[in-house]
């Protein structure tokens, strides 16, 4: 974040600030300091240079986003984490269905964990009258890998785009150099997560999925919301989302594995030993995942899952507060064993 300020000043995108309080508030704003969103000086710093008053509507919206973030973290991510740890630790003794569930649970563990933190951070910032950039845009409803990366960890991917990809020449330096630049971005994205070959391979895996779309000029095809203005997607969209989701799940196996051998062994066992036998216990996360997907599907054109327009049935304050209390109590009752936020380690 401090680096973005230096670069933006150097590139004359923003003037150097002489307000030391505003500058230190920018680089140390606590809601998003640990795990994002990674803010730009052009967006966040000017908000500390002007007077801000308390906004009731903004605070209410912030509390809604905090509540939804807590649900994603405490109910979805933490309950998935217990099953994920068990399955990945004992994967060599389990059947393919168990292994697929382990991969599925980790897919939603990392989403609930990371996007939940982002929701909490963005909501907390709103209580202070500060607007942070959106970090997740319902990525598991993507129709191809390019769309997934426009919706996943938006603050980091756009940071890499603006400060690495474009300075390298972007896509205006010829197709081969543009492909090279794209590959570099994905490898840097993997290396950013840690000095483990699994992260590098995860980045390379996504690069291999992205580059064919880039070569065919289809990497910016799906920029709208899936099934926009419709209740359900069509068959083509369902197939696109399903295939994209499976590819993302495979990528998360590589990301979660301790080493490359384990990742390959896990995937091979999952495919060759698939037995269609559901485990007798540990299926509760499926219910929480289903709730998450249903809510976010119907809210996919909004900023976050609990963003409510005060009209229709929600124009009544009693209805809104009942919803808040039900979700809050449900989160407390169904919360899994407390787990540290995954992205605290990166």
Show the residue positions of the predicted features.
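Membrane-embedded transmembrane alpha-helical bundles that form the catalytic cores
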Residues: 2-345
């Amino acid at each position: 974040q401090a680096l973005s300020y230096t670069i933006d000043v150097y590139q004359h995108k923003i003037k150097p600030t002489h307000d030391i309080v505003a500058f230190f508030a920018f680089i140390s704003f606590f809601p998003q300091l640990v795990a994002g969103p990674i803010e730009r000086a052009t967006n966040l710093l000017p908000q500390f240079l002007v007077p801000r008053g308390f906004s009731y509507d903004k605070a209410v919206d912030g509390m809604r986003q905090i509540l939804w973030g807590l649900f994603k973290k405490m109910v979805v991510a933490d309950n998935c984490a217990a099953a994920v740890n068990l399955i990945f630790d004992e994967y060599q003794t389990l059947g393919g269905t168990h292994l697929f569930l382990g991969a599925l649970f980790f897919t939603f563990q990392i989403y609930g964990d990371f996007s939940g933190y982002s929701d909490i951070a963005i909501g907390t910032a709103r209580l202070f009258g500060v607007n942070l950039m959106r970090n997740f845009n319902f990525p598991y409803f993507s129709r191809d890998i390019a769309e997934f990366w426009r919706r996943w960890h938006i603050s980091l991917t756009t940071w890499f785009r603006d400060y690495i990809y474009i300075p390298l020449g972007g896509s205006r330096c010829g197709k081969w150099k543009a492909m090279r630049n794209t590959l570099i971005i994905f490898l840097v994205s993997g290396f950013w997560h840690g000095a483990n070959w699994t992260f590098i391979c995860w980045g390379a895996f996504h690069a291999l999925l992205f580059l064919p779309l880039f070569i065919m000029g289809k990497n910016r095809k799906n920029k709208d919301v899936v099934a926009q203005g419709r209740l359900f997607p069509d068959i083509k969209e369902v197939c696109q989302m399903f295939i994209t989701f499976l590819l993302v799940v495979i990528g998360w196996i590589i990301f979660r594995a301790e080493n490359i051998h384990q990742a390959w062994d896990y995937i091979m066992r999952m495919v060759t030993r698939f037995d269609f036998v559901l485990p007798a216990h540990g299926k509760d996360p499926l219910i929480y995942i289903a709730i998450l997907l249903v809510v976010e599907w119907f809210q996919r054109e909004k900023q976050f899952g609990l963003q409510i327009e005060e009209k229709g049935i929600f124009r009544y304050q009693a209805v809104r507060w009942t919803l808040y209390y039900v979700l809050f109590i449900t989160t407390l009752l169904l919360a899994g064993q407390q787990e540290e936020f995954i992205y605290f380690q990166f």
